[in-house]
């Protein structure tokens, strides 16, 4: 549910009404991670209000321009210095909405208005429909959002479309990065800040462009009864006009319990293989090598490895090998299978 109060929602609704249709639809995509498809402008505004965690988060969005907030305050009779920066205007707006609230809080629950009842019924209907998640579509929408956002941080492609950062990950997210290019290596990263910065460096400092292959071979999805959704995607790696190789990436997504229909990244396995390291005769069209049953088994591996009883064995194994090796002793066959799928590295 929305983290905005009733007055904040009404104020932001009027403020958003000053944006044009393209800006509203783009803002809706950003706020909902492209997982909500509005049917019209009003539906998009409603989604923006419902899925925003708080009013500051919404007003700080790049697509909510400083001039729009200033114009809204002027229409409400709030006079502010024209040179006030955006963060100052946000505070003016918050103060204005707070002043509109009754000085004494009502002790009795107010009678719900007709539109409030309709909104509640609509939300309940959406919640019921959300239980039947199309994971294939969710995977496609997620990949479109993730790779567009990540690739837009490449300085050769102009200004970023939106802010990249740790807010898209769970705080204890884990990244396992395996690459086989001029050399072969595997590194683990942990924590939202560290994982976010490592992925960002691929496009911002190494100038890579990851192009996902979202057909039936390049994208596979699976879910667990605990709410973990796994998305596997393969694609090609580019720099400028050169295709450098292929990649395979597995995401573990968990729905946020605090923001409706919002998913955050719990773990990532990323494997990049340079074109010079591909086995002779390999097809350049990338495809996910895991089957649906492998996804489910891989989820079980991750779950087991987070238990205290298994973690010491995991560390021992990670310290002794390279590539996507065994995570837990009981699932050697599965992850050894993936290790076998890696192309034989070139000898130098």
Curated annotation (Swiss-Prot):
Question: What Gene Ontology terms for biological process does this UniProt record contain?
Answer: apoptotic process; positive regulation of apoptotic process
Top-level taxon: Eukaryota
Give the function comment from the record: May be involved in apoptosis regulation.
Q: Could you tell me which Pfam families the record lists for this protein? A: DUF4518
Q: Which UniProt keywords apply?
A: Apoptosis
Q: Which InterPro entries match?
A: NTF2-like_dom_sf (IPR032710), UPF_C3orf38 (IPR026698)
The name on file for this protein is: Uncharacterized protein C3orf38 homolog
Statement: the UniProt record of this protein carries the keyword Iron-sulfur: no
Asked if the Swiss-Prot or TrEMBL record annotates the protein with the keyword Nucleotide-binding, the reply is: no
Q: Name one GO cellular component term.
A: nucleus
Q: Which species expresses this protein natively?
A: Rattus norvegicus (Rat)
| UniProt xrefs under SUPFAM superfamilies | NTF2-like (SSF54427)
């Amino acid at each position: 549910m929305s983290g905005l109060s009733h007055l904040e929602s009404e104020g932001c609704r009027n403020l958003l009404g000053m944006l044009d249709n393209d800006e509203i639809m783009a803002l809706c995509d950003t706020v909902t991670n492209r997982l909500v498809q509005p049917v019209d402008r009003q539906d998009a505004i409603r989604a923006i209000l419902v899925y925003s965690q708080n009013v500051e988060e919404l007003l700080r969005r790049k697509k909510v321009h400083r001039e729009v907030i200033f114009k809204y305050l002027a229409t409400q009779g709030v006079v502010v210095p024209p040179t006030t920066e955006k963060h100052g205007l946000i505070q003016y707006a918050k103060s204005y909405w707070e002043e509109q609230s009754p000085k004494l809080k009502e002790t009795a629950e107010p009678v719900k208005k007709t539109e409030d009842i309709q909104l509640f019924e609509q939300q309940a209907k959406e919640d019921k429909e959300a239980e039947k998640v199309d994971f294939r579509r969710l995977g496609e929408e997620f990949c479109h959002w993730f790779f567009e956002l990540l690739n837009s941080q490449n300085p050769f492609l102009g200004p970023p479309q939106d802010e990249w950062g740790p807010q898209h990950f769970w705080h204890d997210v884990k990244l396992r990065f395996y690459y086989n290019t001029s050399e072969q290596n595997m590194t683990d990263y942990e924590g939202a800040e560290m994982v976010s910065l490592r992925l960002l460096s691929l496009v911002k400092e190494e100038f890579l462009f990851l192009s996902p292959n979202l057909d039936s071979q390049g994208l596979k999805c699976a879910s667990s009864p605990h709410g973990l959704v796994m998305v596997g995607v393969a694609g090609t790696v580019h720099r400028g006009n050169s295709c450098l190789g292929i990649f395979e990436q597995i995401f573990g997504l968990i729905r946020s319990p605090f923001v409706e229909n919002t998913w955050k990244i719990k773990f990532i396995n990323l494997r990049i293989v340079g074109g010079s390291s591909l086995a002779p005769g390999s097809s350049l069209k990338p495809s996910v090598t895991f089957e649906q049953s492998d996804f489910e088994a891989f989820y079980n591996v991750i779950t087991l490895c987070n238990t205290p009883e298994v973690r010491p064995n995991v560390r021992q194994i990670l310290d002794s090998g390279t590539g996507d090796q065994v995570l837990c002793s009981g699932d050697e066959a599965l992850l050894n299978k993936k290790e076998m799928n890696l192309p034989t590295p070139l000898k130098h």
